[in-house]
């Protein structure tokens, strides 16, 4: 699939996202991109359902989305920004670090995460940093900075 595949309305379907990111079930954690400003920002949705495998053990009597999966969702949105930058080399950008991540509210089955990532920097065409936030019903549930690195 062509690296530059955003439609005219700057949105991506789940099928198009699968063409950009290597993640597959159960780690494909972005359902749709609803806004994209190339090279700067992406806003995406993750619908959280009780059918997801993590809820069998986290926690059966009070299911909560693990914080690490919220961060991974934000990282995947950041990965979409990086893959859509025309001046960067093609290849696999992997999640390389996090800074200042804060979890503010639980995320429950039935919630819809609205994830916003903004590009902060690109260095030597190999390293990227984004600021990410995840909201549910307009309330901030998680925020932090995420780093990416191009794998040779």
From Swiss-Prot:
CDD domains from the UniProt entry: FabZ
Cysteines paired by S-S bonds: none
Main subcellular localisation: cytoplasm
Classification via SUPFAM superfamilies: Thioesterase/thiol ester dehydrase-isomerase (SSF54637)
One GO molecular-function entry: (3R)-hydroxyacyl-[acyl-carrier-protein] dehydratase activity
Location within or outside the cell: Cytoplasm
Keyword presence, Cytoplasm: yes
Pfam families: FabA (PF07977)
GO terms under biological process: fatty acid biosynthetic process; lipid A biosynthetic process
Annotated Gene Ontology cellular component terms: cytoplasm; membrane
Residues forming the catalytic site: 58
EC class: lyase
Entry EC number(s): 4.2.1.59
Alphabetical keyword list: Cytoplasm, Lipid A biosynthesis, Lipid biosynthesis, Lipid metabolism, Lyase
Domain of life (superkingdom): Bacteria
Catalysed conversion reaction: a (3R)-hydroxyacyl-[ACP] = a (2E)-enoyl-[ACP] + H2O
Family matches, as HAMAP family: FabZ (MF_00406)
Similarity annotation: Belongs to the thioester dehydratase family. FabZ subfamily.
Its biological purpose: Involved in unsaturated fatty acids biosynthesis. Catalyzes the dehydration of short chain beta-hydroxyacyl-ACPs and long chain saturated and unsaturated beta-hydroxyacyl-ACPs.
PANTHER family associated with the record: 3-HYDROXYACYL-[ACYL-CARRIER-PROTEIN] DEHYDRATASE (PTHR30272:SF1)
Protein name: 3-hydroxyacyl-[acyl-carrier-protein] dehydratase FabZ
Gene: fabZ
């Amino acid at each position: 699939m062509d690296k530059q595949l955003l439609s005219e309305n700057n949105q991506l379907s789940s099928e198009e996202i699968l063409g950009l990111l290597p993640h597959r079930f159960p780690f494909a954690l972005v359902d749709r991109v609803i806004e994209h400003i190339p090279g700067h920002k992406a806003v995406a949705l993750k619908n959280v359902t009780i059918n997801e495998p993590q809820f069998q053990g986290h926690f059966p009597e009070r299911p909560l989305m693990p914080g690490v999966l919220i961060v991974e969702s934000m990282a995947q949105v950041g990965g979409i920004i990086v893959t859509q930058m025309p001046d960067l080399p093609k290849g696999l950008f992997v999640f390389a670090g996090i800074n200042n991540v804060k979890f503010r509210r639980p995320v429950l089955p039935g919630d819809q995460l609205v994830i916003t990532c903004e590009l902060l920097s690109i260095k030597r065409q190999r390293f990227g940093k984004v600021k990410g936030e995840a909201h549910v019903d307009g309330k901030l549930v998680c925020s932090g900075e995420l780093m990416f690195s191009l794998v040779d």
